[in-house]
Amino acid sequence: YATSSHFSWTDATEFRKFCQDAGIPCKPLPVEEYFQPGLCDGAFLTEEYTYDAHILRDYLMEEIAKYPGIKLHFGRKITEIEKQTDCYEVTALHEGKQEAYRAPFVLNATYASVNQILRKVKGAETQDFGLKYELCEIILCKASDKIRNIGFTVMDGPFFSIMPFGKTGYHSLTSVTFTPHKTSYDATPQFPCVGENGNCCQGGFLGNCNDCPGRPESAWEYMSTLARKYMREEYAFSYEKSLFSMKPILKASEIDDSRPTVIRALSEDPVFISVLSGKINTVYDLDPFLD
């Protein structure tokens, strides 16, 4: 981690105190070994945990396989959810055919589609999550040997981070300023590209931005220029590909940049729970509801 000499909300002294107070390992490093002269007032070696989404997915699939009663249905578009006396009936479309599922427990964990799903519920009073939406880009880079096993984050302001991306062998490059391409403050995601002919988001359903012809042009030029402005030349990296995603953010989190897990119970008998988790390490807040 490094604190920028300009336009940062935090300086080196404050960052070191934060780490000490939180019990986070934080070793001061010579700034000039990693960053261009005069741009950072402190650099620190810290320890940060990450995860590989594919490994996590495979683990969960293995756990699910232990329960023969669980069936997974992919590629369904939910059109209606109706509350019955003892269950919810979920109607969905699959390959042009209508399907219906009935269950006494419904968990709405659809991330950026959470409000879209809530608006399909009938027979129960719903409330939208107070969200804004960002159409974001994470750039995957090939990193030189010099940077292969380490990551850089410059803070605390309009800066950047480049760090190992799970076990893919790539580094992810993100920027506070350039990672979000577009922002929507509507209750459900509303962007100029939504509903355009051939685009993936149609009729109240979110698509996959990576497969969409209407996805934005990459901000690689801007992000890489910002990172190279700060980093020494020997810490080289090159563009490999971009990942685009719709990111929901609680409007209440704009003040402190918090990423809580928010859980709302729509009804208890039958059960309908909606969950929006801002970061994977806060998802454990859901355990009491599942128990």
Task: Name every feature range the model reports, one short phrase each.
Residues 1-32:
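Dinucleotide-binding Rossmann-like beta1-alpha1 core, especially the glycine-rich loop
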Residues 27-29, 71-73, 238-240:
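General small-molecule cofactor/ligand-binding pocket signal
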Residues 43-105, 109-119, 283-291:
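Helical element adjacent to the flavin cofactor pocket in flavoenzyme catalytic cores
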Residues 47, 55, 221-291:
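C-terminal catalytic lobe of FAD-dependent flavoproteins
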Residues 81-84, 163-165, 264-266:
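Short beta-strand micro-motifs enriched in acidic
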Residues 97-155, 165-170, 182, 193:
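Central helical "cap/lid" subdomain
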Residues 161, 170-174:
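A conserved active-site cap/scaffold subdomain adjacent to cofactor or substrate pockets
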Residues 166-170, 178-247:
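Flavin-binding catalytic cores
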